[in-house]
């Protein structure tokens, strides 16, 4: 609005600017839509996605399974825990068996890493290969991995140790399983030798 228009209407310029902005927001359908969208997004950000706040239960998620007692597995015994035959999902990485059931969306039958469920995933994770053919059915000693692949595998091992419950170890053919007490946690080979 030009200065002559303001003088001609006899209105205070500060009143017109404030009223003009509010008037522009509330009279334009597009601006009302954008304002509503901004308020909705602000509400979602502040409120967040709080589970149980709406009162509905997520029927897709089964109730959590009780913690598995420590024990060792042969590759054949491990295969049962693929999320199909048994609701629990176990994976072996670097000789350690982890309960990854809480990561069902990733490691379950329909997940992107479902090929590793109930298997020794070490070779697949070390080589970034998601093909079932890359995994061995028997114990894999991983002796042919390059140093870079071994380092990648160690990174995966650390990540799984931090995130998932370590259940036991993967047994080589003819190896005797460790007998764990009910409250004992499985240890890796280095920790076991230092005791």
From Swiss-Prot:
Post-translational modification: O-glycosylated; contains chondroitin sulfate attached to Ser-54. Ser-54 is in the cytoplasmic domain but the glycosylated form was detected in urine, suggesting that the membrane-bound form is cleaved, allowing for production of a secreted form which is glycosylated.
Lumenal-facing ranges: 2-24
Region listing for Disordered, in residue ranges: 51-72, 173-195
InterPro entries for the chain: Cyt_B5-like_heme/steroid-bd, Cyt_B5-like_heme/steroid_sf, MAPR/NEUFC/NENF-like
Modified residues (Phosphothreonine): 74
Phosphoserine carried by residues: 54, 181
Presence of the UniProt keyword Metal-binding in the record: yes
GO molecular function, one term: steroid binding
GO cellular component: cell body; endomembrane system; endoplasmic reticulum; extracellular region; membrane; mitochondrial outer membrane; neuron projection; neuronal cell body
Misc. remarks from the entry: Non-classical progesterone receptors involved in extranuclear signaling are classified in 2 groups: the class II progestin and adipoQ receptor (PAQR) family (also called mPRs) (PAQR5, PAQR6, PAQR7, PAQR8 and PAQR9) and the b5-like heme/steroid-binding protein family (also called MAPRs) (PGRMC1, PGRMC2, NENF and CYB5D2).
Known function: Component of a progesterone-binding protein complex. Binds progesterone. Has many reported cellular functions (heme homeostasis, interaction with CYPs). Required for the maintenance of uterine histoarchitecture and normal female reproductive lifespan. Intracellular heme chaperone. Regulates heme synthesis via interactions with FECH and acts as a heme donor for at least some hemoproteins. May be implicated in 2,3,7,8-tetrachlorodibenzo-p-dioxin (TCDD) immunotoxicity.
Known partners and oligomeric status: Homodimer. Forms stable homodimer through hydrophobic heme-heme stacking interactions. Interacts with FECH; the interaction results in decreased FECH activity. Interacts with EGFR, CYP1A1 and CYP3A4; the interactions require PGRMC1 homodimerization. Interacts with TMEM97 and LDLR; the interaction increases LDL internalization.
Domain commentary: The cytochrome b5 heme-binding domain lacks the conserved iron-binding His residues at positions 107 and 131.
Protein name from the UniProt record: Membrane-associated progesterone receptor component 1
Native source organism of the sequence: Rattus norvegicus (Rat)
The encoding gene: Pgrmc1
